[in-house]
Design a protein with these regions (language model features):
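N-terminal chloroplast transit peptides
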Residues: 1-28
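Proteolytic processing junctions in secreted/extracellular precursors
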Residues: 19, 31-38, 43
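Intrinsically disordered, low-complexity, compositionally biased regions/tails
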Residues: 23-27, 36, 313
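IMPase-like, lithium-sensitive Mg2+-dependent phosphomonoesterase catalytic core
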Residues: 38-90, 95, 101-352
């Protein structure tokens, strides 16, 4: 019904505009109006996240929608706050909490309000905290890449949703949903559900259309193929990890394109959007990967594998890592099957 009303409003608006504009301006106005109408019609035809989640368990839908609401609020805070590495300032110049703490609080508040979350844990506060609900438990990194936010680079949020009330003694194989939000020129969330194939992208509509403020499905990621694109994290490890050094040299000799932003969320997101490439963050004798399995490694592995790629900690899928503590870390590679297998062959698990 909502879509029917939107279509009628858009068509009537276009008709009334064209009916009253005359002379040389009419053709130009007509073209602009037609483009606007097509834009609105296309948006109105796309499923909202609420509609898309109708296939999910009711409590999983509530937990997932809580994350979408939180990410919408975080997107607004990022765009309207002036931040440095220590604190943020609102539009009135008042000092606030650092933006990653603000994001942390927003997510906890939304998860508590959902009634569908028993336990939640954040990378900022790596404890298992009761949320007062039941059904699922959520682990999240509230603002991945926050160290580069003052430079206005893209940053993101990562989360995973497990059944039950605990977040240790589990693995990524038990995930029921996972998602990443990208706060860049556009705000998008890519999410995957246990009972649906593929990973699905939603766009936060923030223009002046009738769909303003809604999350609209815009893409579906089904395959990650071969392509010469790589995003190498922890490059210092090439100095004392011969396998990583050899792998990096392979990329250079074969003219791969370097696409590394300093944030794992946008780097992984580009692999799904482009449908090719590989991201890795590797251990060595002196430098260990800081990626936490619960908050980052497992949820992104879930998204990548749902999108048709592979993940690996050097020997096996990152989804098979047993999560024994909230602070457990691991090296990882995500991307096209052949690239991840090359990572396993050259890097392996020697420095795990």
């Amino acid at each position: 019904m909502l879509r029917l009303v939107l279509l009628v409003v858009v068509c009537l608006s276009s008709y009334s505009v064209l009916g009253f504009v005359r002379g040389p301006a009419a053709n130009s106005f007509s073209r602009r109006s037609s483009l606007k109408m097509m834009s609105d019609l296309n948006l109105a035809a796309m499923p909202t996240v609420e509609e898309w989640l109708d296939v999910a368990d009711p409590k999983l839908k509530k937990a997932t929608l809580a994350m979408f609401r939180a990410c919408k609020e975080i997107a607004y805070k990022i765009r309207t706050a002036s931040c440095d590495k220590m604190a943020c300032f609102n539009e009135f110049g008042d000092e606030q909490l650092a933006i990653d703490i603000l994001a942390n609080n927003v997510i906890f508040d939304n998860l508590k309000a959902s009634g569908a979350v028993a336990t939640a844990s954040s990378e900022e506060t790596p404890t298992e905290d009761p949320m007062g609900g039941s059904g699922y438990s959520v682990a999240f990194d509230p603002l991945d890449g926050s160290s580069v936010i003052d430079t206005n680079f893209a940053v993101g949020t990562i989360w995973g949703c497990w059944p039950g009330d605990k977040l240790t003694g589990i693995s990524g194989r038990q995930l029921k949903a996972a998602g990443i939000a990208v706060y860049g020129p556009r705000t998008t969330i890519t999410v995957a559900l246990d009972n649906l194939p593929h990973s699905h992208e939603f766009l936060l509509v923030d223009d002046f259309s009738a769909m303003h403020g809604q999350w609209i499905k815009t893409n579906e990621f089904m395959s990650i193929g071969e392509g010469k694109l790589f995003a190498p994290g922890n490059l210092r490890a090439t100095q004392d990890n011969p396998g990583y050094q050899e792998l990096f040299q392979y990329y250079m000799e074969n003219m791969y394109q370097l696409r590394y932003t300093g944030g794992m969320v946008p780097d992984v997101n580009q692999i799904m959007v482009k449908g090719k490439g590989v991201f890795m963050n590797v251990n060595s004798k002196k430098t260990k990967s800081k990626l936490r399995v619960l908050y980052e490694v497992a949820p992104i592995a879930y998204l990548i594998e749902k999108a048709g790629g592979l993940s690996s900690e050097g020997e096996k899928s990152a989804l098979d890592i047993s999560i024994d503590t909230t602070e457990q870390t691991s090296q990882v590679a995500y991307g096209s099957p052949d690239e991840v297998k090359r990572f396993e062959k050259l890097v392996g698990r020697k420095y795990l």
